[in-house]
């Protein structure tokens, strides 16, 4: 089961969805904010199905979200509007170009080097094959939710990946997908209806050319199962442990032995006769660790383990007793072990962040260390020659060797991600998250240009039209403006005590609107190219938190959406509400990022509860609208989406709620961010 929020805006609460039981609310601790109850709502939380209405005399279309009416006035030049007209999907598609990030925070044993020169790992619902030398990525997108485990077949081509319970009606239960890493073709799907919550560990057998696959799920008993994967047949299964299981590996010299380890245990399983028979490792005179964290196999078949006490134990081949101990090998846990091609052993520490090279007879040879910024070692993977790769707990991948500094190949946010802004004139975009990190990325190089750590978690971002200044909205009620080139603070302001969901400059750069979770929109006058700010006032009228804002092309008006499905309009200079909505029907909006209004009234699928769609973006050429939903999908519409239940084309990759989408200036690329999946994805419009 994926530990994710119901995918409303943070600090809001909404009914749980029937296909994803047990997902916690996305409200932040301490927040009293909830999405307002709809008028006429039922205590049972049933979805409403009132049909859309068109009033030709008044010139509006009315849709209903959880029973609440949302009135959308048609532009005055729209004639002969047909409510039931078909709205076809666009001919354009999205092609996934790049996935920013790696899931190291809470997964392990998930980084391998393939003979193609690609490193393989996963982020969100995508398995990434990254060729570092050629600087390109390929992607396996067969999963519909978080990938949690991976195994590479002895043929180095066939891959097994396991996922959590997901959204798909047919393949939404936890399962394993077997696929070809050359063609990206799915070969087999295992365990639909068998696994519980998630598949957390996988291993192919070695000696018999990988005929069998072992898997462990995240049920209360952490069931271990063995499969003939080509026949999609389960051969045996047993309850493994009531405590967490962190790894599962076939012995490379004995296909009748599987080793599992985790909290307080290491188990040696014998598969002879089609049954799984367990023998527990005996620690005897040595301290039993709280966690056995990692294992590797030597050339002679011995098993090496690393534990939470920082000790390395050697278990003789075919034995369940410790034959040798290296006590205090690390200060703190040993998160990963890796046997190099020459028989030497790498160990990676958590607390001490050290990578230590040991000789084949377990003498310490060399020591190096990863930085605080990239985080402790999560997993180690041997590369070519003396080189190796390091996956870290801060979602980074490094490359290097014992003799030099590490090169950061992959970087990502480490907590929930909402903030996204595209540079107005350059091929750059900026993301900011609850991890307090603000990162400027390069579209072409796919790497950070700079990274700045803030004092508070970050919620939103927006560039000044000059591109020289960027405003960041915080989760604390503060907002700041940064110099893009130097990253120096230009100004710091506090408005209220709640997060600022949206922050956006007017097209002429003379105003800044800060939309807050306290129901207000704060307006500032901006001068000196974004370097001086004077408060104009605040827009007061919403009865729930503000979720989206857009400026008019002439920088005089604002439109805003709220958590209780209000669509309001404002005069920017006076902060007064424009109460006669018909007066805004012909306003040209510089951007369209809201989820309410005539141009987007068709984005809501049948049975929507009003929180299903989190974000939209109109392309710069005005031909397309992208939306991001609760189910990890990006939906591409023909703009304007002015007919209810419009057709769209959907694209998957994210596993959590899609929190932001944005097109670049020439409408050829789109950037999307995931909430709890912490990922950022770059797409081409084709």
UniProtKB/Swiss-Prot annotation:
GO molecular function: microtubule binding
Gene3D superfamilies: YVTN repeat-like/Quinoprotein amine dehydrogenase
SUPFAM superfamilies: Quinoprotein alcohol dehydrogenase-like (SSF50998), YVTN repeat-like/Quinoprotein amine dehydrogenase (SSF50969)
InterPro entries: Beta-prop_EML-like_2nd (IPR055442), Beta-prop_EML_1st (IPR055439), HELP (IPR005108), Quino_amine_DH_bsu (IPR011044), Quinoprotein_ADH-like_sf (IPR011047), WD40/YVTN_repeat-like_dom_sf (IPR015943), WD40_rpt (IPR001680), WD_repeat_EMAP (IPR050630)
Start and stop residues of the WD repeats: 142-189, 194-237, 240-279, 287-325, 329-368, 412-451, 495-534, 541-580, 608-647, 653-685
Region spans: Disordered: 1-53
Keywords, comma-separated and alphabetical: Cytoplasm, Cytoskeleton, Microtubule, Repeat, WD repeat
Polar residues composition-biased segments: 1-14
Domain of life where this protein originates: Eukaryota
Family, similarity comment: Belongs to the WD repeat EMAP family.
Name listed for the protein in its UniProt record: 77 kDa echinoderm microtubule-associated protein
Organism: Strongylocentrotus purpuratus
């Amino acid at each position: 089961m994926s530990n994710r929020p119901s995918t409303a805006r943070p600090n809001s609460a909404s009914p749980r969805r029937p296909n994803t039981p047990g997902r916690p609310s996305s409200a932040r601790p301490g927040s009293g904010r909830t999405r307002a109850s709809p008028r006429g709502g039922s205590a049972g939380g049933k979805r409403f199905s009132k049909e859309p209405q068109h009033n030709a005399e008044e010139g509006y279309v009315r849709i209903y979200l959880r029973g609440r009416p949302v009135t959308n006035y048609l532009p005055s030049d729209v004639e002969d509007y047909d409510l039931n007209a078909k709205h076809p999907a666009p001919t354009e598609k999205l092609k996934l170009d790049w996935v920013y990030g790696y899931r190291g925070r809470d997964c392990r044993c998930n980084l391998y080097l393939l003979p193609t020169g690609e490193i393989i790992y996963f982020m969100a619902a995508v398995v990434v094959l990254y060729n570092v030398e050629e600087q390109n990525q390929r992607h396996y997108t067969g999963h519909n939710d978080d990938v949690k485990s991976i195994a590479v077949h002895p043929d180095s081509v066939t891959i097994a990946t396991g996922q959590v319970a997901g959204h798909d009606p047919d393949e939404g239960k936890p399962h394993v997908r077997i696929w070809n890493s050359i063609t990206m073709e799915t070969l087999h799907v295992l365990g639909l209806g068998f696994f519980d919550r998630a598949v957390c560990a996988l291993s192919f057998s070695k000696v018999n050319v990988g005929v069998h696959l072992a898997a462990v799920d995240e049920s209360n008993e952490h069931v271990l199962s063995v499969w003939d994967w080509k026949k999609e047949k389960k051969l045996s299964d047993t309850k493994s442990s009531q405590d967490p299981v962190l790894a599962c590996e076939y012995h490379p010299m004995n296909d009748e032995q599987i080793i599992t380890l985790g909290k307080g245990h290491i188990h040696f399983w014998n598969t002879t006769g089609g049954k799984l028979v367990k023998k527990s490792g005996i620690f005897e005179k040595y301290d039993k660790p709280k966690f056995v964290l990692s294992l590797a196999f030597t050339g002679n078949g011995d098993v090496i383990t690393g534990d939470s006490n920082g000790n390395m134990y050697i278990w003789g081949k075919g034995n369940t007793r410790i034959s040798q101990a290296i006590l205090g090998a690390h200060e703190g846990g040993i998160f990963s072990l890796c046997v190099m091609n020459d028989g030497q052993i790498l160990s990676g520490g958590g607390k001490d962040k050290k990578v230590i090279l040991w000789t084949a007879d377990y003498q310490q040879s060399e020591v190096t260390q990863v930085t605080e910024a990239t985080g402790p070692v999560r997993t180690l993977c041997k590369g070519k020659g003396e080189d190796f790769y390091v996956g870290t707990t801060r979602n980074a991948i490094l490359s290097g060797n014992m003799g030099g500094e590490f090169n950061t190949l992959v970087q990502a946010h480490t907590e929930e991600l909402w903030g996204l802004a595209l540079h107005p004139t350059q091929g750059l975009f900026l993301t900011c998250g609850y991890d307090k990190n603000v990162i400027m990325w390069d579209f072409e190089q796919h790497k950070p240009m700079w990274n700045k750590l803030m004092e508070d978690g970050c919620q939103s971002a927006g560039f000044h039209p000059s591109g020289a200044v960027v405003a960041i909205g915080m989760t604390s009620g503060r907002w700041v403006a940064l110099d893009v080139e130097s990253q120096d603070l230009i100004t710091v302001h506090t408005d209220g005590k709640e997060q600022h969901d949206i922050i956006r400059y007017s097209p002429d750069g003379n105003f800044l609107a800060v939309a807050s979770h306290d129901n207000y929109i704060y307006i500032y006058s901006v001068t000196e190219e974004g370097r001086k700010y004077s408060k104009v006032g605040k827009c007061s009228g919403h009865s729930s938190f503000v979720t989206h804002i857009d400026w008019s092309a002439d920088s005089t008006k604002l439109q805003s959406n709220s958590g209780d499905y209000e669509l309001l309009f404002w005069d920017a200079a006076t902060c007064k509400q424009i109460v006669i909505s018909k007066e805004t029907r012909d306003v040209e909006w510089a951007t369209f990022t809201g989820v309410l209004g005539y141009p987007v009234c068709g984005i809501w699928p049948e049975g929507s509860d009003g929180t299903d769609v989190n974000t939209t973006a109109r392309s710069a050429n005005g031909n397309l609208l992208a939306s991001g939903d609760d189910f990890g999908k990006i939906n591409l519409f023909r703009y304007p989406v002015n007919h209810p239940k419009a057709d769209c084309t959907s694209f998957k990759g994210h596993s959590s709620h899609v929190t932001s989408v944005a097109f670049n200036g020439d409408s050829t690329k789109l950037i999307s961010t995931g909430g709890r999946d912490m990922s950022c994805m770059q797409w081409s419009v084709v």
